[in-house]
Amino acid sequence: MLISTAAVLAVVLLLQLVVSPLLNRRVYTDDLVDGSGYPTFDVGMSALAGLYMPLGDYYGSYAEHSGFMRDTLHLTFYDRTGSNRFNIQTQTGLSLGHVGQLNSGDLHAIGYMYSGFFYDNRNPGRNDVWSGDTGQAALDALPEYMRLTSAVSFHKVLTVDELADIMARHPDVDFLSANVWVDGAYNYDSLHCSLQHMMLAYGDDLEEDYPGMQLQEYKNLTGEDITQHFRAMVQYLADHPEVAKAGPDEPYRYKEMLLNLEEDGLEVLGLWVQGTPDQITALLDEELVRSVGNYDARIQLWT
């Protein structure tokens, strides 16, 4: 009996002190591993933010041992709308090399798992401002010291080249993210492609392995630049299913997205932007723009 008890305790200690840490370190580590030059988990979180969090970005993490064979990952996300002054904090678990899913409630403020804003290009968001005299007057009534976060809806599904043309004609507008679609994704309503550079700089090694992923030059983008940025983020998650499991799509779907991206290209369903009332109003002059929905308005403290 004593031998059996000792054997059980030995197995438990082996799991707790050796096996679990080794498996968890395959998913999360603060150190650079395999000479890759970038932290695998953090890059994966940045990719998930770029694909599913149109109003925010990933800002960092740390791990804390929290129980038997379990670590808690403390994650920070940046809120581009300014609603959360001290950024957004959330947690997920890591046990025996399996990471838990992200908390959609904590991340809702930055657009994680949003639905309905661009459904069938009919619903651009709340507080709709339609193109035309009424919408123009509503935007004109806002003072120029306001900074708007707005959802832009189109008359039709756009190509990435058409999106790039609109961006080129409005250099003063901050284009945050495009609501996009490629076959293979589970829910087209929540899939996006960020149009801003990643908050964390991962260096040349990541750029060499996944060209365009960091979107270091995010001004004057071409349609191919946007497609390559999307391709790189999806490819990274396809290559790292252990991190991709934290997101809303099953890891195998990223491989399907890549195949369909090459065959059919990337479709643009809507757009998230920031700017002054005049800058947002100018978008209504675009022939392809159907409407603008003001999601958030804040006083701009800089010029």
Where do the PLM segments sit?
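Short beta-strands and strand-coil junctions in structured, solvent-facing domains, enriched
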Residues: 159, 279-280
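Active-site-adjacent structural elements in enzyme catalytic domains
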Residues: 266, 277-278
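Hydrophobic membrane-insertion alpha-helices, especially the h-region
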Residues: 2-18
